[in-house]
Design a protein with these regions (language model features):
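Membrane-interfacial helical/loop segments at transmembrane boundaries in membrane proteins
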Residues: 166-167, 314-318
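Cytosolic-side membrane-insertion boundary helix
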Residues: 26-56
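Alpha-helical transmembrane segments with an aromatic anchor "belt"
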Residues: 74-75, 215-219
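Hydrophobic cores of alpha-helical transmembrane segments in multi-pass integral membrane proteins
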Residues: 16, 44-68, 79-106, 110-162, ...
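Soluble extramembrane regions of membrane proteins in the secretory/endomembrane system
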Residues: 1-38
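Juxtamembrane inter-helical linkers in multi-pass membrane proteins
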Residues: 204-216
Length: 348
C-alpha cells in the first residue's frame, strides 16, 4: 500500500479513451456527464411540481376571490406576480426537459415517467396560451401540471434514463408521440374547466350564481377552444402514428388496443364538440358534464392500455403502477358534484 494513485488514474484514463473509440454504442461525453450529475442533484421536476401546485392554488384562490368580490383590485398587486411565477416555473420545467434531452440524446418522452413529464409541460403550456383570456385557466393548468409532476415523482415511476427499444429508434418518436401526448394536456384543462363550471353552478345563493353566470359562459368558451385544440392534436397524432406503424410493422392500422382506444377518444371528443346541435345537450351544464366525463377515455388510452392490456404500445409503459383506486374515488366525488350541480340548476 503505497498510497499513490497516479498509475491507477492513468489506467482509468486509458480505459476511458479506449471505450470512447471502440464502443459500439456512443458513450456520454464529459459535458453530458457533468450535466447528468447536475440534473440528478437539482431535482428540477420535483421543485417544479411543488411550485406549480403552490402558486397555482394561490392564483386560483385570488382569481375566484376577485370574481366573488369584483371591487377588490388584486390584478396588479397579487395576480400578475403570481402569473410571473408560473412562467418562471414553466421555464424551470422546460430546462429540465431540455437537460434530459441533451443527456439521453433523444426526445425525452419514450417511457411512462418521461411521458408524464411531457404531459405536465403540455398542460402548463395550454394554460399559458389562454392567459390573455383567463387567469383562472392558467391557475387550473398550473395546479394540474403540479399534480402530474408529483405523481411522476412517486416511487412507482422509474426516472432512469434508458436506451430506446429498437422500434422507438425513429424520428417519428419526436413527432407522433409529442403531438398526440400534447392533446392530453388540453383535455386535462377541459376537465378542470368543466369541474370549475359545475362548482360555480353549485353555489347555493342565487345571487352568487347570477354574479358568476358571465364567467360560466366565459369558461365554456375557453373549454370549447381547449377541446378543439386537443382534438386537432389527437387526430393529427393518430394519422402520424398510422404512418409510423406502416414503416415499423408494414400496416397503417391493425386495431391494436392503443390504436382502438385513441380512435374511441377521438370519437368521444368529436361528439362532445358537436353535441350542442342537439337541443337536450345544448346547456352549459350538459357541456361541462361531458367535458369532465370525456377524460375517462383519455385515462383508458394512456394508462389502461399501457398497463392493463396487451398491446404493441406497452413498451412505453414501464413499471406497472398501483390500481386505479384514486381515479375511482375522484370520479365518485365528481359524480356527486354533477348531481348536486344539476339539482341546483333545476332549483334555480
Amino acid at each position: 500500500r503505497t498510497g499513490t494513485w497516479e498509475s491507477a488514474g492513468e489506467v482509468l484514463s486509458m480505459m476511458n479513451v479506449y471505450q470512447q473509440k471502440q464502443s459500439a454504442t456512443p458513450l456520454l461525453t464529459e459535458k453530458q456527464v457533468s450535466w447528468e450529475l447536475f440534473y440528478n442533484k437539482a431535482h428540477l421536476f420535483f421543485w417544479s411540481a411543488m411550485g406549480y401546485m403552490a402558486v397555482g392554488l394561490l392564483l386560483l384562490i385570488f382569481v375566484v376571490g376577485q370574481l366573488l368580490k369584483p371591487g377588490r383590485c388584486l390584478l396588479k398587486t397579487i395576480i400578475i406576480p403570481l402569473v410571473t411565477l408560473v412562467v418562471l416555473i414553466f421555464l424551470l420545467h422546460t430546462s429540465g426537459i431540455g437537460i434530459r434531452w441533451y443527456i439521453s440524446g433523444r426526445a425525452p418522452w419514450a417511457n411512462a415517467y418521461e411521458s408524464m413529464i411531457y404531459v405536465a409541460w403540455a398542460t402548463a403550456l395550454a394554460g399559458l396560451l389562454f392567459i390573455k383570456r383567463s387567469s383562472m385557466t392558467l391557475a387550473l393548468a398550473a395546479f394540474f401540471a403540479g399534480i402530474i409532476l408529483f405523481v411522476a415523482n412517486l416511487n412507482f415511476m422509474d426516472p432512469e434514463i434508458t436506451p430506446l427499444v429498437p422500434v422507438l429508434k425513429s424520428y417519428w418518436l419526436m413527432i407522433h408521440v409529442a403531438v398526440i401526448t400534447a392533446s392530453y394536456g388540453f383535455f386535462g384543462i377541459s376537465f378542470l374547466l368543466g369541474l370549475l363550471t359545475l362548482a360555480f353552478m353549485s353555489a347555493g345563493n342565487p345571487s352568487k350564481v347570477a354574479l358568476l353566470q358571465p364567467h360560466i359562459r366565459e369558461l365554456r368558451i375557453i373549454n370549447e377552444m381547449s377541446l378543439h385544440i386537443g382534438l386537432y392534436l389527437l387526430t393529427a397524432g393518430i394519422f402520424l402514428g398510422a404512418v409510423w406503424a406502416n414503416e415499423s410493422w408494414g400496416r397503417y392500422w391493425g386495431w391494436d388496443p392503443k390504436e382502438t382506444w385513441a380512435l374511441i377518444t377521438m370519437v368521444v371528443y368529436a361528439f362532445i364538440l358537436h353535441a350542442r346541435f342537439l337541443p337536450v345537450l345544448r346547456s352549459d351544464y350538459a357541456f361541462s358534464v361531458m367535458s369532465v366525463l370525456g377524460l375517462a377515455s383519455v385515462l383508458m388510452t394512456y394508462f389502461g392500455v399501457n398497463y392493463y392490456l396487451s398491446s404493441l404500445h406497452s413498451y412505453g409503459g414501464g413499471d406497472t403502477p398501483p390500481g386505479l383506486t384514486a381515479v375511482f374515488i375522484t370520479y365518485a366525488c365528481v359524480f356527486a358534484l354533477m348531481i348536486y350541480a344539476g339539482y341546483s340548476q333545476r332549483r334555480q
